[in-house]
Amino acid sequence: MAISRRQFLTMVGIGAAGAPALLRNGYAASRDRVTIYHSSVADSINPYNHSSSPIYGDWQHIMEPLIELDYAKKDYVGVLAESWQFQGNKWLFKLKKNIKFHNGAPLTSKDVAFSIEKMRDEKGGSLQAPNFKDVTEVQTPDDQTVIFVTKQPLAIFLDRLENRFILSKVAGDKFGDKLYDNPIGTGPYKFVSYQRGGNMVFTRNDEYWGGKAAIKEVIFRKVTEDAARLAALESGQADFINNVPDHEVARLQKHPRVRIDKVEGLRMFFLAFNMAFKPWDNKLVRQAANYSVDAPAIIKNIFDGIGYPINGPVGANVIGADPALKRYPYDPQKAKQLLAQAGFPNGCDIQLYYSAGRYPKDKEVCQVVAAQMVKGGFNVELISQEWALFWDKQGVNGGKLPFYYIGRGSLTDADTLYDQYFRTGTTKRTNYSNPELDKIVEEQQKTPDQKKRIALLRRAGKMIMEEATFIPLYNLADIYGLARNLIWKMRPDEKVLGWDMKIK
């Protein structure tokens, strides 16, 4: 899509006459404000009604988790938690002292228990409930201690706690159902406003317990069109954008205002089957689909070779990856043979769903996938849906999309994928059910010995590939464009954090 300067100015709500005021400081980010144009910004004011890494980054400006993964250390570090212990079917956490919410109330264990209760409230719109399905009780013996009691030893519980943000119970008791209209957390920024559709504004918390951020105001604007984000960056309307198209990198590197940063991403892209729909309940058809898709060719032809094909059910850097496993080779003739065996000698009609603009070149990817699958004997109808609708149908309680293109962000442990997509009853994303696989996944979840747990994950991965439960594709490089005078800390998890930024 080509977009003119005048078209862009119209899109952002000003006429051409307003351009000079807009652009007069366009070649340098403000020292007080950073404006971020992002393809994925929260679609709901409820911070628990999401399950997406970049959106977690939005909310983390104002509220914080107990722990988070340090990607450099490849281990968990405390945020609100000072320490933690694994005690059989219990996890005991000690909270840091002298932390206050934005309303002045001190952080206590009661706030943690209150927030977990909100996260488990599926009827209230939370998508976080599956993370606590194995928790039977949350105990608060004193203000600084939280104990999670689980059905059985749960060695992987720390992974479940990442991105689980804590809100103020005092605010919850005061505002009730209106709590999310002005969420109160402990984070480095305070909530200012939210506009439905994906515009958020945060202002600095000058009394933040972890030290004052350099940037005073952070603005997120949801812009799904690549061309619109690029125009905003080049004009100075935006200081930072995500999902820079790879074919634009060389040109933008010559731009006087723009710098390009790249990092290997943790988001794994794949095509998911929903076994509640025919023909995906047929293993032969799923295998045929795997033989029909050429991921390396997609990386080469669409992403200019900037990508990392996945050769098993998870990428090589994920805990539990098995280098012995290989992806299905591209073999359209083999696909046709399998379809004939499955009862489709004249081809098979399918629908492929995606959300245009959510991921880099997602429309082009799905068009190429459809063309590849036609050669394998499939007749593919492409259907694009706005992200909120797509997510509602695909997400935790969805189960309404038969076949879809999706990216799983911040995938560091194979358990996350196996549990959320292939364990019976965890979610409705694929409606796959295999008691033998369930047993292996559940066994590794309670195995504290990491070597033994990885061996179990590899057994599960082998079964997943044999059953052709989905089509693993690739990891991509996350490509960002930003003002040259903006310094930030790059992360592989797609979070864009204002307190990691400063102006030079």
Language-model segments: residues:
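N-terminal lobe/hinge region of extracytoplasmic solute-binding protein
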Residues: 37-89, 117, 184-185
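Alpha-helical secondary-structure segments
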Residues: 108-115, 143-147, 187-188, 215-217, ...
